[in-house]
């Protein structure tokens, strides 16, 4: 079952990085908040999306063991080209015309995030993407994209322009703002940050 209050949407978890700053560890399989990230994200959006996917170049069997109903795919092109490539590749697999992309390292998942992203796109018909902003910081990979964004994604990649910020500007991107008190890290970018995040959670 999916939420009937918004158009049919698929979820894609972006986990296609090289994990160089994580000492090779797959962030999606780490525990940030006493729960494996994959489970945390999957359970948060269960019943709100049609199908859940993972954009990743590794560990596909492990993902399916953790969440049996989840599906995964690799980047269309090799070379770890970043989230833009994961987004472009997704449209070859999903059937929905809207995709909610969630980075694997995000620490805070607002309860109403999907609803508010859809509302933003409905209020701004010219926009092809709405992204999350937490405590004033833009999380461009945490976004809702329309299928009509594919030509722009493809063109930017062909030109070697892999910046989400620049790409989204071409799509008339809308920011949806959230606030979270005492949030030190909105995402985890390194092994050291993960250790700090866990220590702070014990203290808070």
Positions of predicted regions on the chain:
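Nucleotide and nucleotide-moiety/phosphate-recognizing core
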Residues: 2-140, 147-161, 166-185, 191-192, ...
């Amino acid at each position: 079952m999916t939420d009937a209050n918004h158009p049919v949407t698929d979820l894609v978890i972006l986990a296609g990085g090289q994990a160089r700053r994580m000492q090779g560890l797959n962030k999606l399989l780490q525990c940030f908040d006493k729960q494996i990230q994959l489970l945390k994200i999957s359970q948060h959006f269960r019943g709100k999306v049609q199908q859940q996917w993972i954009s990743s170049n590794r560990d596909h069997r492990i993902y399916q063991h953790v969440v049996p109903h989840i599906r995964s795919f690799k980047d269309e092109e090799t070379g770890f080209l970043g989230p833009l490539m994961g987004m472009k590749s997704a449209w070859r697999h999903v059937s929905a015309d809207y995709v909610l992309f969630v980075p694997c390292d995000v620490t805070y998942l607002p309860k109403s995030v999907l609803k508010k992203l859809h509302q933003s796109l409905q209020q701004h018909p010219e926009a092809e993407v709405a992204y999350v902003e937490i405590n004033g910081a833009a999380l461009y990979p945490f976004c809702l994209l329309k299928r009509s964004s594919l030509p722009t994604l493809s063109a930017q990649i062909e030109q070697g322009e892999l910046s989400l910020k620049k790409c989204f500007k071409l799509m008339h991107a809308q920011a949806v703002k959230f606030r979270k008190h005492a949030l030190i890290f909105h995402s985890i970018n390194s092994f050291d940050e993960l250790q700090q995040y866990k220590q702070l959670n014990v203290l808070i």
